[in-house]
Amino acid sequence: MELQLALDLVNIPEAIELVKEVEQYIDVVEIGTPVVINEGLRAVKEIKEAFPQLKVLADLKIMDAGGYEIMKASEAGADIITVLGATDDATIKGAVEEAKKQKKKILVDMINVKDIESRAKEIDALGVDYICVHTGYDLQAEGKNSFEELTTIKNTVKNAKTAIAGGIKLDTLPEVIQQKPDLVIVGGGITSAADKAETASKMKQLIVQG
């Protein structure tokens, strides 16, 4: 089980400062979609250069032109790139093919997929590396989370690793860990904490204890 820090509402210098505080406790640093929109893939490049020991995920949420966008993110230094589960199989296949060429990983984000179980089965057959259940900001505001969906993909997915994102905090982490996802993605649960290093340290401890 690995811990991923999601960075969404920062610029590049702020991102670097934030990662410095918690780098010893995290395995993956995510350059979130808002950061990519504001800063471009330069953000991926600069974080990878600053923290070569960490895996960097580029949250591109690819919906089309899978191969091309994977190629560009790979050139910037991304280790893992996201594709949306709601896209068509051709886009996912193109992304997987290019990722294999570049020796990179694909994480499929199941945000807003209505039938998680049947779509996860289909995607699992396409050779992706991770399948991630994800409750976005707008639904988190309505009090929703992806904990039940995690159970569904844990029971369904046979080849890919499993991941969960959206609204995970220190007090809800034990519930997530019970399901044994391969990757736990935390954003505000760390970035909004008064003591980020202490929170990340406690989260990592819980994850290691598993």
Swiss-Prot record:
Q: What is its EC number?
A: 4.1.2.43
Q: What is this protein called?
A: 3-hexulose-6-phosphate synthase
Pfam families, sorted: OMPdecase
Q: Where are the disulfide bridges?
A: none
First-level EC class: lyase
Name its pathway.
One-carbon metabolism; formaldehyde assimilation via RuMP pathway; D-fructose 6-phosphate from D-ribulose 5-phosphate and formaldehyde: step 1/2
Report which superkingdom the organism of origin falls in. Bacteria
Name one process (GO BP) from the record: formaldehyde assimilation via ribulose monophosphate cycle
Task: State the protein's purpose.
Answer: Catalyzes the condensation of ribulose 5-phosphate with formaldehyde to form 3-hexulose 6-phosphate. Together with HxlB, may act as a formaldehyde detoxification system.
Q: What does the induction field say?
A: By formaldehyde, under the control of HxlR. Not induced by methanol, formate, or methylamine.
The yes or no answer to whether the keyword Magnesium is present is no
Q: Which reaction does it catalyse?
A: D-ribulose 5-phosphate + formaldehyde = D-arabino-hex-3-ulose 6-phosphate
Give the family this protein belongs to, as stated in its UniProt record: Belongs to the HPS/KGPDC family. HPS subfamily.
Which keywords annotate this record? Carbohydrate metabolism, Detoxification, Lyase, One-carbon metabolism
Q: Identify the Gene3D superfamilies for this entry.
A: Aldolase class I
Q: Which GO terms describe its molecular function?
A: 3-dehydro-L-gulonate-6-phosphate decarboxylase activity; hexulose-6-phosphate synthase activity; orotidine-5'-phosphate decarboxylase activity
